[in-house]
């Protein structure tokens, strides 16, 4: 790719077709895609109902800007609000959604300090990069946006020592995806929420990777009983079309009036047509119950077949966001699996990250388990011989 900046270390395959969980490269080789485009294609590749909704919108109107009223925006926002007193700001990506959340928090509170957590990932624009507590993400870009403070994840005493009257907001993920697929302890999250309420600090939850059914509920925070002041969405909201959303309690609206923030393409009608059908699908009776049943089945098989292997340290995560921490580096496993027709990711040097579409079949889960076990066993034999 000689005309594209090398900002990604790309896998040496060019995927040109996809249906459901199966993708095909330009040479005709097929793969089971257990990456979902990094937790994006939650309904699988090219779901027919979403394609039909987008196709219908293509023949009507594509883009008008946010200078005009838009019934489609309002209907999608209502679906996102999910019966709660929430308002939505539409944008194009997760990092934009997080930028909007950070701006809203500072403007509403009039304070600057924002607490985030070590190994977090919130994006790569300057505000969201500054919120990301990973030195490797910051390297080479000079001074960060001031006002961000990082504390250890799952350490309530460290958090208690840091939150104060100068704090505008706390931003966190209920499962740190890029940071190694590390779940937060429920007790930790509930105590964070309690302290935020006590101190008048806004709680922001980054649901870019964990939201839209990925962890078994529409939003990951619902499983713990959290009520964030603000949360952010992207990835699965468009199933491959670029869309993000910052969702806040309605009482925050006074800080985000005309001219306070904006996005030229945010709320684009093509992306919204997809989002509306995706949300409608996920809210259908039995959909998330089936996702949870398949996720439980997958986790059970992972534990039965992989947990006892000497090169597997721990299996963690939630729903269809799974991390397998290895004793050795993860990249050789990912490479061998790709050669054998299974696509997965890493999350750090020694963690496999597995993100199948929510629509994956039981047979596809069985095949993935077979490949994972055979490759990990083969890697173990190779390391012993080496």
Swiss-Prot record:
Q: List, alphabetically, the SUPFAM superfamilies matched.
A: PLP-dependent transferases (SSF53383)
Please list the residues that bind pyridoxal 5'-phosphate: 94-95, 121, 206-209, 264
EC identifiers of the protein? 2.6.1.11
The cross-references to InterPro entries, in alphabetical order and at most eight, read: AcOrn/SuccOrn_fam (IPR004636), Aminotrans_3 (IPR005814), Aminotrans_3_PPA_site (IPR049704), Class-III_PLP-dep_AT (IPR050103), PyrdxlP-dep_Trfase (IPR015424), PyrdxlP-dep_Trfase_major (IPR015421), PyrdxlP-dep_Trfase_small (IPR015422)
Q: Which domain of life is it from?
A: Bacteria
According to UniProt, the reaction catalysed is: N(2)-acetyl-L-ornithine + 2-oxoglutarate = N-acetyl-L-glutamate 5-semialdehyde + L-glutamate
In the record, N6-(pyridoxal phosphate)lysine modifications are located at 235
Q: Which GO terms describe its cellular component?
A: cytoplasm
Q: Which family does it belong to?
A: Belongs to the class-III pyridoxal-phosphate-dependent aminotransferase family. ArgD subfamily.
Cofactor: binding comment: Binds 1 pyridoxal phosphate per subunit.
Residues the entry annotates as binding N(2)-acetyl-L-ornithine: 124, 263
Give the record's pathway.
Amino-acid biosynthesis; L-arginine biosynthesis; N(2)-acetyl-L-ornithine from L-glutamate: step 4/4
Which chain regions cross the lipid bilayer? Answer: none
Protein name listed in UniProt? Acetylornithine aminotransferase
Keyword list, A-Z? Amino-acid biosynthesis, Aminotransferase, Arginine biosynthesis, Cytoplasm, Pyridoxal phosphate, Transferase
MF-aspect GO terms: identical protein binding; N2-acetyl-L-ornithine:2-oxoglutarate 5-aminotransferase activity; pyridoxal phosphate binding
Organism of origin: Listeria monocytogenes serotype 4b (strain F2365)
Coiled coil location: none
